[in-house]
Every structure is written in structure tokens, then in C-alpha cells.
UniProtKB/Swiss-Prot annotation:
Cofactor note (record): Binds 1 Fe(2+) ion per subunit.
Protein name per Swiss-Prot or TrEMBL: Carotenoid 9,10(9',10')-cleavage dioxygenase 1
Keyword ATP-binding recorded: no
Keyword hit for RNA-binding: no
GO molecular function: carotenoid dioxygenase activity; metal ion binding
Description of what induces expression: Constitutively expressed in embryos.
Originating organism: Phaseolus vulgaris
Keyword entries, A-Z: Dioxygenase, Iron, Metal-binding, Oxidoreductase
Length: 543
């Protein structure tokens, strides 16, 4: 990439987020109306499970250096391990869903065996406006149930129509995931555009602005774009409640976003993830459908799952200019939050994914029980034959597995190992599991344990819970063994009330961690993690 590409990509497309909310008479009248609705229609006795314990929010922490390290931090971990998650700055007016919290990034800067911890809010338009008012103002997923939900939607529409809230920079939380592309760390949530984050030498994090790719991005942007490690391109999509329900995008290694490719499907769905191979993009038309009428009628969330519909998978040549050559495949009804990887094998496209039989987003609402008896997320292999048009699937694990990660040097190419989290609820990670896709699963096992295709299981132990683990190779590229590296994750000890970062040997999955870093503050449970290498940190520092 020449200097011109760097210059244009760095300056073009980064928008300073400067919303203009108004706090006049209209604002006060709507606040009063909202207060009355909450008083008469909301059951305030309902507990906010996802605001208690280690789900509860924390304040920002500036860089805190020279943390206690038990063991050693290998040189390949020089860089910054970051994880984002929901952390509401202001108390909710009524309901609260785990997905509602403001995005906060927790970072561990590692350099020459030493560790520094930092946590910073992503300075979104939404957060800036609520800071201006000093209270919660934006609509929450946790409110979107029944008649009360419909009325709260109208309150939100009134606030935007009367310019109490300014949606010209979107209204997302940016609390879901992180990716690095074209010299920028991007913080993501699927209801908004990406926010660019600068990582400083001391580990500190600063929100630079919103990325709109020189006004070429006019729709939402998935929290799970895919970066091809061989070409440097990034592949993405957005979903919407109005047609086109899915829009596919390709971004060059130089940061140029190509023209949109609309994908035609029958219903407005939630599509949280997708996949790429060397030549294809894989879309998932799964029946978690946006149905506001059912929200009012059945007192459910605004997305409802239709168990009568098949799961559809669309395979599109990844550089297609339109959807003309997309091939659709059907499999039994399911939902998928997260894919591990995909690749091509002879006439087939292979997808490794975490398949969920019964998605109930209510389970991550405010009143959920601690354990989820029916949350059965299992590792699956799905195959789509491009020659015959047939689809098949094979179960690879018992329940419950999520947040699958691979050595990302193999993104879109055949790989052997998958690392996932074991869960005792939708949010409580009890350990890290390693699958060997070359081995056959042991279907006699009803729970996740070593044997068959389960090559290792790192159990966090009683009262200790984690979040997504990121694989970091010891050597860049694919010349060394695929599992020659480390897994890094945040861990919270509920008994001691302390948080840590664990570093695990990804090859041996030894119960003895390579390193444990004690953190100065509690780190709440969150969503997706990422590792910014030392090379990337130095590259983005030039912007």
C-alpha cells in the first residue's frame, strides 16, 4: 500500500461525533410523560439481574502500570489485549437488557513482560447525549415488551422528532466486538457504524470518531466483520428492519468500501454473524424475526423466533456485484449467534458454527434466572454442496459452547482447532475448551469433557467466571503449528471479588496457566475480545 492510500484512509471517512441534543420545554414534557408511563405500566419490582454482582457497571480506570504477574508473559503477547462489553453509565428509567449497556473497553497493555490495565468508555453519540442530560434518555431493548414497549418506542420517536435527541450520528452503544483493519482498531455494535479507537503506547484508549468510509457507509455495520489475513480485505454486512434487509460490503486493504450488494430475504431478521471462505461469503437467514406486533400481543421482545421456519444459508461469490449468483441451502430450524470459521473443500463450503436450538433473548433480560436449563448451544459442522445443492450438518459437541475462536491466520481457510467457552448460563463462562476437528466426536458423552474431539478443557474453578478467549500465535503467519500459541481471557473470582487476566498454553491446555495478571479493579462480564499486536499498535500510532 502506497503513502497515498494511507493518507486517504486515515483522513477520509473518520467523522468527529458532535451531536446537538436540546434540553428545553419539549424535553421536560416528554420526561414527564415517560415518568407517568413507567409509574403506571412498568413493574418496578422486577429485578435487574444484569446490573448486579459482576454484571454491575464500573467507572473508567486510567492506565495502571506494573501489575502483579504470576508466571511470565511471553514476548509474542507484546501489544494490547482488549475486550468490550456493556457498562451503563446511567441507571435505566425502567427495563434493562444485557445488550443495553454503554460500550466500555478493558485493555491489558503488555510490553516486555510487564502489564498495564486501562478501561475507557467508547465515546458514542448516545453516551455523549446522555452525559449532556445527566441521565438515561435513549430507548432500551429491555423496555421493548408488550404495550409498554410500544409506548416507549413512541417516546423515543417523539424525542427524535422534536430534536431532543440527535440521531445524525446514530444511537448505538458500540458494546459488542472489536476488529483491527487498515491501521485502526474499530469498536462495533450491529445497530451502528464503527467507532475508531486509538491505542496509545502506555495502553490508554481514546475514541477518535465514527467511521463512515467517506460517506459510503449509509447503513448499520455488523459486529462480526471478517478480515482475510491473506488479502488484507475486510468483509462486512448490515441488517435492517426495512428492505433490503441485508446489505453486503467489501472493504479493500486500503480502507476503500466498495458498492453495496443488497441481499433479498423474506423477513427482517437478526443476523449477528456471517462467514467467508477464499471465494465465498456465507449469509444466514435464520428465523429470529423483527415483529413489533407480536411484541405487543405476546409481551415478548421485539425479535421473536419462528420455530416453524427452516434455517437458510446463502453462499455468494465474495466479490459479486449483485446477488444474482447467490445459492440458498436449507437445514433444520435453528439460530446461530457465532461462527468459528468456514472454508472450501472440493465441491463443498464448510461452516463450523455454534448452533442454538432455542434462542430466547428474554433470557438476557433483567429478570433471568442464574442457570439456563434450556440454552443448548453446540458446535456443529455444516456443509453446502455447490454442485448438488444439498446441505448437511453434523453435531460436534455436547452443550453448551459459544464464543468460538480459531487461529485467525486461517480465517476463510481450512483449520484444525477451535477454541470456545463453556457456559453454565448465557453469560457465565466456566472455562475454555479446545476441539480437534480431525478427531471424531464422542456422542456417548452428555457433557463437555476431554475425549473424542475435545482435546483440552481449562476449567476456571468454583466461583470463577470468564469471557471470550483470544488465540495469539507464538509466531505470525501459518508456518508454525496451528495451535502453537496462547489463549488470553479476563477472569473474575466472585469469591474474592477480584479480576485477573489468564494466559493459557493453547497447545497443551494445561490447568497451570502460563501467567496470571492481577487487575486493580473489577472487570464486569462482557462480550468479545481482540488482540492488537505490537506491530499494529505502532502502525496505528502513525495516524
Amino acid at each position: 500500500m502506497g503513502d497515498d492510500g494511507k493518507k486517504n484512509g486515515a483522513e477520509g471517512g473518520l467523522v468527529k461525533v458532535d451531536p446537538k441534543p436540546t434540553n428545553g420545554f419539549s424535553s421536560k414534557v416528554i420526561d414527564l410523560l415517560e415518568k407517568l408511563l413507567v409509574k403506571f405500566l412498568y413493574d418496578s419490582s422486577l429485578p435487574h439481574h444484569y446490573l448486579t454482582g459482576n454484571f454491575g457497571p464500573v467507572t473508567e480506570t486510567p492506565p495502571t502500570k506494573d501489575l502483579p504477574v504470576k508466571g511470565h508473559l511471553p514476548d509474542c503477547l507484546n501489544g494490547e489485549f482488549v475486550r468490550v462489553g456493556p457498562n451503563p453509565k446511567f441507571a435505566p428509567v425502567a427495563g434493562y437488557h444485557w445488550f443495553d449497556g454503554d460500550g466500555m473497553i478493558h485493555g491489558l497493555r503488555i510490553k516486555d513482560g510487564k502489564a498495564t490495565y486501562v478501561s475507557r468508555f467508547v465515546e458514542t453519540s448516545r453516551l455523549k447525549q446522555e452525559e449532556y442530560f445527566g441521565r438515561s434518555k435513549f430507548m432500551k431493548i429491555g423496555d421493548l415488551k408488550g404495550l409498554f414497549g410500544l409506548l416507549m418506542v413512541n417516546i423515543h420517536m417523539l424525542r427524535t422528532k422534536l430534536k431532543v435527541l440527535d440521531l445524525s450520528y446514530g444511537g448505538g452503544t458500540t458494546n459488542t466486538a472489536l476488529v483491527y483493519h487498515h491501521g485502526k482498531l474499530l469498536a462495533l455494535s450491529e445497530a451502528d457504524k464503527p467507532y475508531a479507537i486509538k491505542v496509545f503506547e502506555d495502553g490508554d484508549l481514546q475514541t477518535l470518531g465514527m467511521l463512515d468510509y467517506d460517506k459510503r457507509l449509509g447503513h448499520s455495520f455488523t459486529a462480526h466483520p471478517k478480515v482475510d489475513p491473506f488479502t488484507g480485505e475486510m468483509f462486512s454486512f448490515g441488517y435492517a428492519h426495512t428492505p433490503p434487509y441485508i446489505t453486503y460490503r467489501v472493504i479493500s486493504k486500503d480502507g476503500y468500501m466498495h458498492d453495496p450488494v443488497p441481499i433479498t430475504i423474506s423477513d427482517p431478521i437478526m443476523m449477528h454473524d456471517f462467514a467467508i471462505t477464499e471465494n465465498y461469503a456465507v449469509f444466514m437467514d435464520l428465523p429470529l424475526i423483527f415483529r413489533p406486533k407480536e411484541m405487543v400481543k405476546n409481551k415478548t421482545l421485539i425479535f421473536s423466533f419462528d420455530s416453524t421456519k427452516k434455517a437458510r444459508f446463502g453462499v455468494l461469490p465474495r466479490y459479486a456485484k449483485d446477488e444474482q449468483h447467490i445459492r440458498w441451502f436449507e437445514l433444520p430450524n435453528c439460530f446461530i449467534f457465532h461462527n468459528a470459521n468456514a472454508w472450501e473443500e472440493e465441491d463443498e463450503v464448510v461452516l463450523i458454527t455454534c448452533r442454538l436450538q432455542n434462542p430466547k433473548l428474554d433470557n438476557v433480560g433483567g429478570t433471568v434466572q442464574e442457570k439456563l436449563e434450556n440454552f443448548s448451544n453446540e458446535l456443529y459442522e455444516m456443509r453446502f454442496n455447490m454442485k448438488t445443492g444439498e446441505a448437511s450438518q453434523k453435531k460436534l459437541s455436547a452443550s453448551t459452547v459459544d464464543f468460538p475462536r480459531v487461529n485467525e491466520n486461517y480465517t476463510g481457510r481450512k483449520q484444525r482447532y477451535v477454541y470456545g467457552t463453556t457456559l453454565d448460563s448465557i453469560a457465565k463462562v466456566t472455562g475454555i475448551i479446545k476441539f480437534d476437528l480431525h478427531a471424531e466426536p464422542d456422542h456417548g458423552k452428555e457433557k463437555l469433557e476431554v475425549g473424542g474431539n475435545v482435546q483440552g478443557l481449562y476449567d476456571l474453578g468454583p466461583g470463577k467466571f470468564g469471557s471470550e478467549a483470544v488465540y495469539i500465535p507464538r509466531v505470525p503467519g501459518i508456518e508454525s503449528e496451528e495451535d502453537d500459541g496462547y489463549l488470553v481471557l479476563f477472569v473474575h473470582d466472585e469469591n474474592a471479588g477480584k479480576s485477573f487476566v489468564h494466559v493459557i498454553d493453547a497447545k497443551t491446555m494445561s490447568a497451570d496457566p502460563v501467567a496470571v495478571v492481577e487487575l486493580p479493579n473489577r472487570v464486569p462480564y462482557g462480550f468479545h475480545a481482540f488482540f492488537v499486536t505490537e506491530e499494529q499498535l505502532q502502525e496505528q500510532a502513525k495516524l
